[in-house]
């Protein structure tokens, strides 16, 4: 039996996210044409190549033209895009955006015709800032919906996903029925799902029954009129295909890969500065001669991205502030969106140990203290997913995250999700890919 839920996808528009990194494959317009009519495909996934849209890149335009010609929804990704650049971005045919971090930004996007997806995830928590403005100004909410963007399994278990967003909205003072609209019919209409998202004759009977509109504790769930809990009893387990394993294949590396010898004393180097509760970063700098002392004091960390799909040997090495880890390293093969191996540490030796551990287990999360592995959570499916039962995995996630925080990772920083976004070169202001440190505002590498 199948899961009692409706499952839809938007085809990834940016694989890789930019030409400034290396991913497992390349998704161009020709590939997308082959997949666009597959069951469950609604439209195009978030168009992260903002300069490519604004300045009319030929390949980007082919993708946009394809989905516009079919009348399909096109998801956007426009962090800090304002004014004339926002107008140009929206004019290309993009329908949604989920990157607003303030009410002022969200309001401008609504005025320009975008549907705004209000985000509350693990690393990015923007709902309160946006909905306070919505509530204070009493605006129409028909072009608003909720999203998580990225949420840890453990956070899903402890908080929920969209229900958590509804609860937060009500707690902020939004009328319960208005808040529920964002979670139901608004989302259905934004994505062109006809006769879904409301209780009405002839509409799909996907229902959640609550005992009240404050706590929103589900009493029963129905999918297409069928009790979802009973339907779950008939689910047939699926064994992951063997081809989805063994994907962590970086070229040979050792402790010298992460050595301070790569930094010249007389040069100034860019430093990524993490922000608690955000995936945006700030820029700072440090002189090469000061790096060793800053590492020792915990002011900066070494950070590296190792290409792990094709064994190219590409390694981007840089510096980061604001993580908090003491005497060790953290590494993960979940590194948006090309999912190379990203590692951060207080020493080359610790980073080498962490990266070697992830090659050994073929992907996942790992935490090192000194040069000894403290804990590892294997993600054996493409280095991204686990075949372990959900409850077991939640316990493992909680445990390794708690150990990372106990080793100094700051509150407001998710040890793994926050780190994973440091490799995504389409979110301001400074990132790192397997090709080096990247300024997303200038859309170029920092030499």
Predicted feature locations:
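Secondary-structure boundary motif
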Residues: 2, 37, 69, 136-139, ...
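Divalent-metal coordination cores built from histidine and acidic residues
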Residues: 1-73, 374-377
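Short beta-strand/turn micro-motifs composed of small residues
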Residues: 11, 78, 307
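Short, basic, glycine/proline-bearing loop/turn elements
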Residues: 16, 46-48, 88, 92, ...
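Sequence-level motif detector for i,i+2 pairs with an aromatic at +2
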Residues: 39, 141, 298-300
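Active-site core of metal-dependent hydrolases
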Residues: 42-183, 188-198, 207, 211-212, ...
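Active-site microenvironment of metallo-dependent hydrolases
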Residues: 157-173, 177-447
